[in-house]
Structure formats: C-alpha cells, structure tokens
Amino acid sequence: MTKEEALKAFAYMGAVWFGNSKQHFAFSAYDRLNGWNKLADKWKAEAEEEWDEAEEVLNRLVELGCKPADLQEAMKTIEFPFYDDPKQQIESDYQPTAVEEMSKLAQAFADDYPTQKLILKWIDGEKEHMEWEAQYLKLIDRLGYDNFLMAMM
C-alpha cells in the first residue's frame, strides 16, 4: 500500500466512524424508547467512542499536513442502515474482518509511529467491540430472543 493509499484508507476510516456513530446513536434512542435500556446504554457508549475516534482521524490528518480541501474524504459520512430489531442491529454491526483490515493499515504506517499507535489503540477497542457483540449474539441463542430482550430492560 502506498503512502497516499494509506492516507486515503485512514481518512475513509474516519468517515466510517462518523457514520457508525450516527447509526449507533439511532439504535440507542430506539432501544431506549422500547425499554431496552442496557442495550441502549451500550449503543450510546459505542456511538460516543466512534465519534471520538473519527475526530482523532481528522486531527491526525491535520497534523500530517492535510488542508481543509484534502479532508473531504474523512468529513463525509458513510451511511449505514437502521434496524429496529436489536438482533439485526448487532448482526449488522458485527464485522469480524475489521481487526484484520485495521492491522494492515497499521502496517502501512510503520514509518509513522503516532499514526500507527492510534490505529493499534483502535484495534484494541475494536476487539472489545467484537467481543461484546459476539457475547450478545450467544446470549440470544442461549436465552432465546424474548428472554434476551427482557434481560436488556
């Protein structure tokens, strides 16, 4: 991956996080309205974390010398679908390949320690994110869907 390709991929990551953040805020609001407050709290925390990560991408791009016109890719928002079904919310967000993709991006920034360090931090967060989603999907299978929803109240 060339340096230019790596920067574009890095900027795209910011756009994805802005979009995911909006999606997760929507999931949180909908789940809270339905009384699934534990799940709503989880989505809200994820939304806030992803918003912060998107801001970190923007800040790092500016530190790397990107001008406002160059930040267009990172500033756009990738749109994600909205699901009113909590199981679909979790399944749609569960992306086991994300850690591998982020690891490749971290390798592309081997000569840029500050950027690589940020990406490695985000990989740890993504692993935690995948763990709770996998855990919740297992709970749905083990408890049954209705019992899972009751547990989320």
Name each model-derived stretch.
Residues 1-153:
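Iron-associated oxidoreductase/ferritin-like identity signal
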